[in-house]
Every structure is written in C-alpha cells, then in structure tokens.
Design a protein with these regions (language model features):
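Active-site/ligand-binding loops adjacent to catalytic centers
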Residues: 43, 48-87, 95, 107, ...
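Phosphate/pyrophosphate-binding loops at sites that engage ATP/ADP/AMP, CoA/4′-phosphopantetheine
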Residues: 101-108
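Active-site-proximal loop->helix
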Residues: 1-57, 153-163
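Gly/Ser/Thr-rich loops at beta-strand to alpha-helix junctions
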Residues: 1, 17-18, 88, 117-123, ...
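Short Gly/Thr/Asp-enriched flexible loops that form oxyanion-binding sites at enzyme active sites
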Residues: 1-5, 123-133
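Phosphate-handling active-site elements
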Residues: 5-14, 133-145
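Buried hydrophobic positions in well-ordered alpha/beta secondary-structure cores of metabolic enzymes
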Residues: 2, 28, 99, 113-115, ...
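Generic beta-strand/beta-sheet core signal
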Residues: 12-14, 38, 82, 115-117, ...
Length: 235
C-alpha cells in the first residue's frame, strides 16, 4: 500500500518473528519498506529494553512503542497499527464475512467459532460477523478465543485501563491486561506475545459473550500435526 501511494514505510517487526519468518520481511523489503527488528537501538524505548534485557526477542507492546516514538519525532510521519484497536478489528471482519458466505454456500452454519488472540485482530476478524447474530438473538454460536498459556491476558488478566504499549505512549485503553510491562516468554507465535486484548474483545469477554482458553505451545504443535495428518492441511 505504501508503494502504491508513494509513501516511505518503516515497519517495526517483533524480533522473534523477524528472525523466524524471513519471507515476510523479504516481501516488505521487496516493496521498498524499511523493516526493523524490535527491540532496536534506533529508539529510546528500544534501547531501554535492550539495556535491561539484552537477549529479549521483543513483543507487540515494544514494537508499538518504537513505532510511536519514530512517528512523534519525525516530521510528517504518521503511525498506524495492525491490531488491538477498534478500526483494525472492523477492517479484519472481511475474514468473517467471507467465512459466513462460504458456510452459506455449503448450507451450513458454525456451532463454534475459534480464533487465536494476541491483540485481537485475528479473533475479531473471524468472530464478529457471526457474533452479531448471537447479539440479535438469531443464533446460539459459541466463540472461543485461544491465547498462549504464556501470555494469558483473557484467562488470568485484569480488566482495567492500561497502556497499549510497553513505554506508555498510547492513550489508556479499557482491556483485559497482564500489565503493559509484562514480559512474555519467547514462544514461536511472535504476534501473540501481547500483554492485553483489544477493548471490544475485552468487553465481550467481560459480558460473557465469548469464552477464552489458554493453551501451552507444545499442545498447539501436537494439534497442528494431528490436523495436518488427518485433514491434509498444514494449519
């Protein structure tokens, strides 16, 4: 999108994802983006994290802090986020709308909708279009947000106002949170290493419209292998 509109793009990518998923990085660089592994030495917030935790593999909260800091210090620079916030959740609902249409074409309707959750964009995208029918009283579908056991904001966090980033640059957001200074474990799913859940998802959990489960990493790998061997699709 930046290339299409003639914009210079800088992306702060969670370091563990930067290292483990080089093809994503290569795609962005091919289109002209500067991709920085977060935490980095290019920002005050990044340097602080690396000074305190030299081998830290990053988190969404740290990457958000670095991106906001760059935007605040660079003239004519704008910051955009790909998770957590309400407008991002709305954009992602195209996923659920397409899924709803596919189910309709197959003559089916889901009893349960499950999605992974870090900041909330994936879960929002798949669940919100179906959830509107439950809120209207037309359906009785269950919704399950699956989070890492090492980052259990919905199952063990507290619902309160908290910052969306580690350095405390963002406005306070009502969310289930483990605290914006929470240090997540170095799990493979870098995009799920986030201390809180978006405000809409958090409110839905508080109102008992969705459920949440925390799953250990090895169990997800085992389930993924089983699914691949039985269904022929690598999840």
């Amino acid at each position: 999108a930046g290339k299409v509109f003639g914009l210079e793009i800088a992306v702060y990518m969670v370091k563990i994802s930067y290292e483990q998923k080089p093809y994503r990085r290569s795609l962005m660089q091919t289109w002209g983006a500067q991709v920085i592994a977060s935490p980095s030495m290019s920002t005050k917030s990044g340097r602080k994290v690396l000074t305190e935790r030299p081998y830290y593999k990053g988190s969404l909260g740290t990457a958000i802090s670095e991106a906001i800091e760059l935007a605040m210090q660079t003239p004519k620079c704008k910051y955009t986020l790909g998770s957590v916030l309400n407008h991002v959740a709305l954009h992602q609902t195209i996923i659920g709308l397409e899924s709803e249409k596919q189910m309709e074409m197959a003559g089916e309707y889901p009893d349960i909708v499950i999605g992974c959750i870090g900041g909330g964009s994936n879960f929002s995208g798949i669940s919100f279009p179906f959830l509107r029918h439950v809120i209207k009283g037309d359906k009785k579908t269950r919704f399950i947000a699956a989070e890492p056991a090492s980052c259990p904001k919905l199952t063990r966090g507290t619902f309160k106002f908290d910052f969306g980033d580690e350095a405390g640059y963002t406005p306070l957001i009502p969310m289930y949170t483990l605290g914006h200074n929470f240090t997540p474990a170095h799990i493979h799913a870098g995009g799920l290493r986030y201390h809180g859940a978006g405000s809409i998802v958090s409110q839905l959990k508080k109102d008992n419209l969705i459920e949440a489960v925390a799953i250990p990493q090895l169990e997800t790998f085992e389930a993924g292998v089983l699914f691949a061997q039985t269904e022929g699709i690598i999840p």
